[in-house]
Amino acid sequence: MKIWLLLGLLLMHEALEDVTGQHPPKNKRPKEPGENRIKPTNKKVKPKIPKIKDRDSADPTPKTQSIMTQMMDKGRFQKPAATLSLVAGQTLELRCKGNKIGWSYPAYLDTFKDTRLSVKQHERYGQLTLVNSTAADTGEFSCWGQLCTGYVCRRDEAKTGSTYIFFTEKGELFVPSPSHFDVVYLNPDRQAVVPCRVTVLSAKVTLHREFPAKEIPANGTDIVYDLKRGFVYLQPHVGHQGVVYCKAEAGGKSQISVKYQLLYAEVPRGPPSTTILASSNKVKGGDDVSVLCTVLGEPDVEVEFRWTYPGQKDERPVTIQDSWRLIHRGLGHTTRISQSVLSIEDFETIDAGYYICTAQNLQGQTTVATTVESS
């Protein structure tokens, strides 16, 4: 009986050793010393990716710094808004920080050499002062710093300032025009502007055709209204020609602008199209001779002429006369003819040779030549 009891206890002890894991299973590798003994779990963990600033996406161009301030009452200064409304008669004083400041203001003030305008450069700032302001002074006022090397200066685009100012005046909803009838040329290769600018920011402006009488809608695709420019024809064509005017309404009052004649110009923009012709290419001594230089171009593009001729070095007296006129070629097409005539009296041997004419406009220049010989 005791033998069976001892045998049972021995078998129970063997079973307990297997359960407590004192003998490692044959199908599992024993852990090496120092090996991580933390059991892995099946939980998925989203890796954290550190945020890296994209240097390439940063704008490398420096931010423009506004250098303009406006003189307020009691000696206070503040940066002007993009648009300002001032009552006509007020004094305007603008300052721009810098020891070399360039200015731009409505061309009206330059055209008439207006003494109401004063521009001064001080040691640390530029100053623009306009006294006795009127509705005609409405427009863009801007300034910029200048980077100079010797006598050559260039605009510093990082230091600029600008504001568009409406000078409101009783009875003047439109910026006054020096004439009662203006001409606007329509070119197929660029925008055309009917300059109906107002003096009141909140004014409602419409465009009208005189005959047949109707309103011309500014639909945003063919014609748009720009507060600072007027009605802009985005793609002018022959059908736009005619007489138009603008109507402004503000504060229960309305006003009609001057009339504008829209003329279509078919000559494309570019350097002058120039020809030269002598009254005779063989001239006898003592006779008179003239050389004509002609340019066909756009109606609103001015042309300048320069001459080179045989007797120029010897200061041979010549007469040079420039002129221009518009030619209407039907269907509203208009061309400008600019001419320069060089005339010589009592032709001499010294006058024989090449006569060279150079015509220049804003797009470039063209040089033509002809010979005049002594017969």
Swiss-Prot record:
Q: Which protein is depicted? A: Platelet-derived growth factor receptor-like protein
Q: Which organism is it from?
A: Bos taurus
Query: Any signal peptide, and if so, which residues?
Result: 1-21
Say yes or no: keyword Signal present.
yes
UniProtKB keywords? Disulfide bond, Glycoprotein, Immunoglobulin domain, Repeat, Secreted, Signal
What does the UniProt entry say about where the protein is found? Secreted
Q: Which residues are glycosylated?
A: N132, N219
Region of interest (Disordered), residue spans = 20-64
**UniProt biased composition (Basic residues):** 40-50
Q: Name one GO cellular component term.
A: extracellular region
